[in-house]
């Protein structure tokens, strides 16, 4: 069963919603104080609207992984241009074009079968073709599947710690 990586097209919204809801259930089970299962009401239609609105945007990337005619996963990313005044910043990478992965989700039944790898490698190739010097993404720090995938399989390194505090 091979995976095909392609831009999303009309009709993919239902499959994208299915994968997103599955990811929500997985993460809500890991940490219910932080994650929730998204509302399914109108979700497929929301994905369809996003497909129509952003399919040909220059600095935004949307990819779908298809296996046997079904959406198996998807990825969204965007380019960030060098920051104004980057020479005055402490962080060197602010002077670079950066590929920011906003979301990468794969149907749980297809984990460890190359779908996430194919999506992320396609995004990296897209970024290289647009002069990106690095890729950045974030994931749940205690994710037992995602963290090893990024660090051990894909060669990503932890670069910072993200803090949060509820107010009220």
What is each of the regions a protein language model found here?
Residues 1-14, 18, 22-25, 29:
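Conserved N-terminal entry element of GNAT/NAT acetyltransferase domains
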Residues 64, 70-78, 100, 105:
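Conserved beta-strand in the GNAT
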Residues 76-100:
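Conserved acyl-donor/pantetheine-binding loop and adjacent beta-alpha core of acyl/acetyltransferases
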Residues 110, 114-122:
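Conserved acetyl-CoA pyrophosphate-binding loop and the N-cap/start of the following alpha-helix
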Residues 120, 127-139:
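Conserved GNAT acetyl-CoA-binding A-motif
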């Amino acid at each position: 069963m091979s995976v095909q990586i392609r831009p999303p097209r009309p009709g993919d919204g239902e499959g994208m919603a299915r994968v997103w809801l599955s990811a929500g259930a997985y993460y809500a089970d890991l940490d219910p104080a932080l994650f929730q299962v998204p509302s399914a009401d109108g979700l497929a239609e929301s994905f369809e609207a996003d497909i129509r609105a952003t399919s040909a945007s220059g600095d935004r990337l949307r990819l779908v992984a298809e296996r046997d005619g079904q959406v198996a996963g998807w990825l969204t990313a965007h380019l960030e241009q060098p920051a104004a005044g980057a020479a005055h910043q402490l962080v060197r990478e602010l002077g670079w074009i950066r590929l920011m992965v906003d979301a990468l989700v794969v149907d749980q039944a297809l984990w460890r079968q190359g779908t996430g790898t194919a999506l992320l490698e396609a995004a990296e190739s897209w970024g290289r073709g647009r002069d990106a010097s690095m890729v950045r993404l974030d994931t749940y720090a205690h994710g037992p599947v995602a963290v090893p995938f990024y660090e051990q399989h894909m060669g990503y390194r932890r670069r910072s710690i993200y803090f949060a505090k509820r107010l009220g």
